[in-house]
């Protein structure tokens, strides 16, 4: 019997306003017109820079404070623009890092999230497991989501991500879960595979795209969850 619903965060409950988690809300305004034009015509190089910068983030993922996160994103943007061979001043990198960490406007929650979670909580515990940074807790709180949750596990607190089964096993222990009684909702089939390996019932969220696999139940929004739960409970 399903009694707990565990969500991923990005792509499931919220999305980056810019369309990219590494492009904060004021990215182009901070860079200025000239640098913005360079980037627009060198998007391939920018993406390569993000890949290189993300390697640094992944290798240094154990952090607990927003101050540590800010310092990490200062280094991240240095790597990105070095990879692009663009001269960006320290003051600009500081502003980008500040915008990436401290500006809640960089994300939007989907319209069904608050009411959807409230409805689900009448019959289920609701939790989040996310590959993320310390500022997520503040973003959740400021958007009225944190107080609705029965549990939150963030990858940065454990230096583990959903790319392996480890973070799911940590969540089982930390949140006292029986994974056989839990749905896990994510927009990444590879994450769902690891969740299933840990014993969770995987559900694929496809907010804006067509499902790339028929291996898992697919939902378009939180209202679709009851039907999935009903079919699982019948089994």
List each model region and its residues.
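Active-site neighborhood of HAD-like aspartate-dependent phosphohydrolases
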Residues: 1-51
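A metal-dependent, Asp-based hydrolase signature
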Residues: 52-97
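Acidic donor-diphosphate engagement hotspot in glycosyltransferases and nucleotidyltransferases
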Residues: 16-18, 112, 132
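A general alpha-helix detector
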Residues: 23-30, 75-80, 135
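Asp-based, Mg2+/Mn2+-dependent phosphohydrolase catalytic module
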Residues: 1-7, 87-89, 114, 118, ...
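Short, acidic loop-to-helix structural element flanking the phosphoryl-transfer center
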Residues: 71, 88-90, 98-127, 165
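Short amphipathic alpha-helical segments at helix boundaries and their inter-helical linkers
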Residues: 54-68, 104-111, 166, 200-201
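Short, well-structured alpha-helical segments
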Residues: 38-51, 90-101, 200
């Amino acid at each position: 019997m399903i009694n707990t619903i565990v969500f991923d965060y990005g792509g499931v409950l919220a999305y980056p306003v810019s369309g990219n988690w590494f492009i904060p809300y004021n990215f182009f305004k901070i860079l200025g017109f000239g640098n913005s034009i360079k980037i627009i015509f060198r998007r391939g190089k920018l993406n390569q820079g993000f890949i290189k910068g993300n390697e640094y983030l992944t290798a240094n993922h154990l952090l607990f404070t927003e101050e540590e996160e800010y310092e990490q994103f200062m280094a991240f943007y240095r790597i990105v623009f070095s990879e692009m061979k663009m001269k960006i001043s320290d003051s600009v990198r500081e502003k980008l890092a500040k915008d990436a960490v401290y500006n809640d406007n960089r994300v939007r929650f989907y319209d069904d999230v608050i009411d959807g979670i409230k409805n689900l909580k009448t019959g289920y515990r609701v939790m989040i497991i996310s590959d993320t940074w310390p500022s997520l807790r503040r973003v959740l709180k400021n958007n009225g989501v944190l107080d609705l949750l029965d549990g939150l596990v963030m990858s940065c607190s454990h230096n583990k991500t959903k790319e392996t089964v480890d973070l799911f096993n940590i969540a089982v222990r930390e949140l006292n879960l029986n994974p056989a009684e839990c749905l896990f909702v994510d927009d990444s089939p590879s994450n769902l595979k690891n969740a299933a390996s840990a014993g969770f019932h995987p559900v694929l969220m496809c907010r804006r795209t067509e499902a790339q696999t028929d291996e898992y139940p697919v939902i378009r929004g939180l209202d679709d969850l009851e039907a999935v739960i009903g079919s699982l409970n019948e089994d």
